[in-house]
Amino acid sequence: MKNPLANLMQQAQRFQETFQKTQEEIAATEIQAESGGGLVKIRMNGKREVLKVEIDPSLRQEEHEVLEDLIAAAFNDGVRRVAKLKQEKMAGLTGSLGIPPGFNLPF
């Protein structure tokens, strides 16, 4: 008969390996976010690092404040998309441990 503690340790090790792999997948994923109907686009990775900002040339320089708002909105859209991706990827992982959906892990 297998030792229950050894079994628990094996499960914890498998969880840690799967968790690490999932974190790496999330970090490598690129998200495209936008605002203003596509006037401002931001590409960011799963670590919430902005990789590229694209501004439609139709935005004139006089619209500086509008542009600032659109960039902030596109960035926030990207952050929400990364959070959703992380939640979706982690749901299966945490569910296997009996952790309730929506429970935010501190990492």
Swiss-Prot record:
CC terms in the record's Gene Ontology section: bacterial nucleoid; cytosol
Pfam families: YbaB_DNA_bd
SUPFAM superfamilies (UniProt xref): YbaB-like
InterPro entries in UniProt: YbaB-like_sf (IPR036894), YbaB/EbfC (IPR004401)
UniProt keyword annotations, A-Z: Cytoplasm, DNA-binding
A GO molecular function held by the record: DNA binding
Keyword match Transmembrane helix: no
UniProt entry tagged with the keyword Aminoacyl-tRNA synthetase: no
Primary location class: cytoplasm
Disulfide bonds: none
Cell location: Cytoplasm, Nucleoid
UniProt family annotation: Belongs to the YbaB/EbfC family.
Function summary: Binds to DNA and alters its conformation. May be involved in regulation of gene expression, nucleoid organization and DNA protection.
Record text on subunit structure and interactions: Homodimer.
Protein name: Nucleoid-associated protein MCA1327
Organism: Methylococcus capsulatus (strain ATCC 33009 / NCIMB 11132 / Bath)
